[in-house]
Structure formats: structure tokens, C-alpha cells
């Protein structure tokens, strides 16, 4: 890892505030992760995740706070490792680590503290399995994705994206103390959804990735293969998302919601593919709708699952 050049560092008189440390945790990214965690808790409990209102509320607070700290810790270490390339990308140049506002040492102390507190909270007030699932997600994101795959292969998102699949397992394990087939489906849905979401983003900022040498799919194999892969993974996502209905884990509320949400995901993926197949470049304006909708798709799909299992349990 290279250090930040002196010319890009902030004046020594400028001190980091709590907002700068909050920015290290990537709060905007974490919001969707926490949503899948919380909705998974309702799915696992088939309703309110507690024997009483207060016990359920306490568990929701513990898992949400601990989940934020664990995911935030992963974001901190991601910024430490990637500070050299973050400085060269417009989207990330202002991050506290790449700008020199927060040193790598202080960031590492902050990130480690968050992770330790998260693990202890989940172990004591959740379940040991929830604590281990949270730690596994952290290790996968920081070590497997950021440290190993991100700079070496265009499969980085396919494999490394599994880190984002752990939050629903954390929520499920916090409620039940174990994992079952339906929890595995939640993991798999996010696994196949991730390339759709992040390759749409990669199309939008591919030139920045190219400049810093990150082998994202559109950089390595071009727009046409990227949109084809997006379409393929969109199909996988929609088909897999509807399979729990067949096994009786959910019923018509989830099925209708999943089918409608999935149909629009497939349509936007097809529109993007058709645009590129016609010989036009995958410009930002044609990738943005899919990128934004993919987040809404996942959020509403998990909400539908929580409502279905609560109402029709």
C-alpha cells in the first residue's frame, strides 16, 4: 500500500471530527445491508422477533447497532487498503483516509474497536452464531474481496460480493440461533443480485476503474459482455428469489411481489443490453436506472418476505 502524497494531504492544523469518522463507515452503503438484516429477523421470527415487545425491540436495537459497527469496520479497513487508488478516483478522492485527514493508524484503531464491540454485543445479547456470521462477513469483505480479489480479477464482484450476503444470516441467527434452507436462499438471492447492481455501477465509472488499474468486467471485457452478464445474473436472481414459494417457505404475498419486482428488474436489464447491442456505448444515463432500481428491488423483496411470513405464518 502506498502512502498519500504530501501535496494531497490536508493542512496539519485541520483535525478530524466525528463526522469524518462516521464517513469512514460508509453509512449510505450500510443502510441496505442493515435493511436485509432487520427484515431477515422478522422473516426468521415469522413476525415480531421477540417473546415480548420489549425483548424484541432490544434484540432489534442490538443487532442493528452491532451490524452497523461490523459493516462500518469493514468499510474502514477497505478505505485504509484502498487509500492509494481512492485518491485517484473522483468518486472517492475526498475520503478521510485518502485525503490524509485521518491516518491509517487511527483509522485501524477505530475499525478494530468497532469490530470487537460488534462481536461482543452479538455474542452477549444476540447469539454466538450471529457474532460469527458477522465476523465472517467482515473477513470476507476485507481480506477476500478488498485485499485479494479486487485488484486481481474481474470476478472480484462475483466472489467477493458474497460479503454482502452475510447480513441476513446475522439477523436470522440472532433470532433463531441457527440457520436453515430459507436463510440460505436469502444469502443466495443477494449473491446473484450483487453483480447486477455493481456491474451497473462499474459501467457508470469504468474509466475511473481503468485509470487506477482495477480489473472490473467492463474494463477487461467491454460493455457488451458486461450487459450480457448483467442480464444473466438478473435471470438467476429472479428465478432463485421465487423458489422459496415452491418449498412452502412463503406464499402469495411474496410471490406476487417478487414476480412484479423481478419483471421490472429483467426489463431494465434487457433495455441496457439492447442499448449496448445496438452499438451504442453504455453511458451513465442508461446504466443509472438499473443501478438505482436494483437497490429498491432488493429492499422491497425482503420487505415482502417479512410481511408474508408475518401475516400468513
UniProtKB/Swiss-Prot annotation:
Keywords: Cell membrane, Heme biosynthesis, Membrane, Transferase, Transmembrane, Transmembrane helix. It catalyses: heme b + (2E,6E)-farnesyl diphosphate + H2O = Fe(II)-heme o + diphosphate. One of its GO terms (molecular function) is protoheme IX farnesyltransferase activity. The keyword RNA-binding does not apply. Coiled coil: none annotated. It holds the Pfam family UbiA. It is found in: Cell membrane. GO terms for biological process: heme biosynthetic process; heme O biosynthetic process. GO terms for cellular component: plasma membrane. Its EC number is 2.5.1.141. It is a multi-pass membrane protein. InterPro entries: Protohaem_IX_farnesylTrfase, UbiA_prenyltransferase, UbiA_prenylTrfase_CS, UbiA_sf. Pathway: Porphyrin-containing compound metabolism; heme O biosynthesis; heme O from protoheme: step 1/1. The chain crosses the membrane at residues 29-49, 57-77, 101-123, 124-144, 157-177, 185-205, 225-245, 247-267, 287-307. Belongs to the UbiA prenyltransferase family. Protoheme IX farnesyltransferase subfamily. Carbon 2 of the heme B porphyrin ring is defined according to the Fischer nomenclature. Converts heme B (protoheme IX) to heme O by substitution of the vinyl group on carbon 2 of heme B porphyrin ring with a hydroxyethyl farnesyl side group. NCBIfam families: cyoE_ctaB, PRK04375.1-2. This is Protoheme IX farnesyltransferase. It comes from Deinococcus radiodurans (strain ATCC 13939 / DSM 20539 / JCM 16871 / CCUG 27074 / LMG 4051 / NBRC 15346 / NCIMB 9279 / VKM B-1422 / R1). The gene is ctaB.
